[in-house]
Amino acid sequence: TMLDKQFLFPVFNADSFGRITAYKNVGEAINDLTDKGEEVPNHIALNHSDIVVRRYELIPEGGKLPKPEFLPEDIRRKNFGNTYTRLSRNEVSSTIVPGNNALPVHPTLNRSLTPREAARIQTFPDDYIFMGDRRSQCIQVGNAVPPLMAAKLAHCVDMYIDGIEYDGIQPDQSFYVNTDNDFSGIQSKAKRATLKFGDLFSGAGGFTRGLEQAGLECVLGAEWNDYAVEAYRKNFGHECLQIDLSTEENQELVAKRLKDAHVDLVVGGPPCQGFSIFGNRRFVNTKS
């Protein structure tokens, strides 16, 4: 932040926010989907091979695949033999990551989670639609900012900008920048209807969903992936630019659009580091 005060992050709680439902554990989030099929949007099960299913059968609820020496020889893995994990219905989920076969194993079924089950855990409602084939849907869900987290952050941002005192925490690595810029143009809550924001590297729109539920108004999204843009446009009525933000020309274009719209803040989930296995944009060597 460039305001002359420290931003405090939300205090942890497991409460729902507005129309975004919080679940206390995996079972509460997805148990009702166990007997349902593809009539539920994005509820598409992966067709695992017989070998993979046999491995899954050996994983206890809340546990991992046994070490290779304890497995039948024909289903042992040469690498990453202990990375298969099965969720527990009575615990919170491990982090949802992107990838067609990257989702954790269902608590009771011998398959990985469906995109919809993963989206439930990420706090997306069932009417929030992800686009493309199953692999693309898994990537969109795994890359998404959970709307519930975004909403609680946005609530703190709103109070922070309005100068309202609130309970919050200061992470060890947080900081603020004190500048000589003039922020007198930021209107008080009494003078504006709501905070306006732009969502860069928006993906399928988890950040936007959460911030809008907190009462903020998105004026522009920006994303380069075909299916993510399609999903964003499916779920929101405002404009989403399909644009590569690695070029200076496009950066200036988006900056002008946001300035013209008089946004109060910019949010975004930038891509992983260039050297990451998930990083498709390797135009910068972030190691150095």
Spans of model-derived segments:
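Class I S-adenosyl-L-methionine
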Residues: 1-78, 253-260, 278-288
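Hydrophobic alpha-helix-in-membranes signature
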Residues: 9, 146, 269-270
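Soluble or luminal CAZymes and related metallo-dependent hydrolases
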Residues: 22, 149, 224
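Residues that flank catalytic or metal-binding motifs in active/ligand-binding sites
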Residues: 26, 92, 236
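A broad, structural surface signal
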Residues: 28, 151-155, 159, 166, ...
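C-terminal target-recognition/interaction regions appended to catalytic cores
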Residues: 33-193
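Core alpha/beta nucleotide-donor-binding catalytic domains of modification enzymes
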Residues: 183-288
